Amino acid sequence: RLFYFTTLGWMMWNWLASGLATGATLLLYDGSPFHPGPAVLFDYAEKERMTHFGTSAKYIDAVKKAGLTPCMTHDLSSLRAMMSTGSPLVAESFDFVYRSIASDLHLASISGGTDIVSCFVLGDPTRPVRRGEIQGPGLGLSVEVWTEDAKKAPTGEKGELVCTKPFTAMPLQFWNDPGDVKYKSAYFERFGFVGAPEAQLPGPVDQRRVLWLAVGSETAA
């Protein structure tokens, strides 16, 4: 029973709809997450026996600032996972979720983008959850953190998130972009194609099939 609080204009709506392919029951909500009361989404989770609760880091922070303790006021025993995206989930928010929402769920901070309608890095139920961190790359994604000179960043050092190999959800071109000028500028201007021999494809190389994405300090984890 999958829920993600999202508008139709956010890519998470498309992400949510893809849950139908797994046989999941989708739970939808339209309106303010704090009306008619600040706990309305937890009311919904309890009533519908929600198993997967998706939201944003800002929502979790707002719930914390509102002083809510859903673990004391609601029956959330059906909840198995909580997902957060939109911005980095800080360590203190991890603490709040496990202290005030549920102590036995899988909390997953995820990061992707509208361009791919997917996640580059996300939760992994087979790995331990560490406060302030994202657990690992999505299936089939060659994700690395690079320095400004296009080298792998040492562990613990901030850098740019890059995906060095083609993957199924990557965009191939932009609409009304003759010669792929805007496309190449958006994805290849920073690092280009140089320095990633592992991204070479069999036969002639088509640069449109390799994506480089920089997301700044969000890769600190």
Question: Could you describe each region identified by the protein language model?
Answer:
Residues 36, 40, 74-77, 178, ...:
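A general alpha-helical scaffold signature found inside nucleotide-binding enzyme cores
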Residues 17-18, 72, 132:
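Short glycine-biased active-site loop of nucleotidyltransferases that positions the nucleotide triphosphate
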Residues 1, 8-52, 66:
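Conserved AMP-binding/adenylation subdomain of ANL enzymes
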Residues 1-3, 162:
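Short, well-ordered beta-strand segments
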Residues 10-14, 60, 171:
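Structured alpha-helical segments in the cores of large, soluble enzyme domains
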Residues 46, 80-210, 217-220:
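Conserved AMP-binding/adenylate-forming
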Residues 7, 30-34, 48-96, 108-115, ...:
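Adenylate-forming
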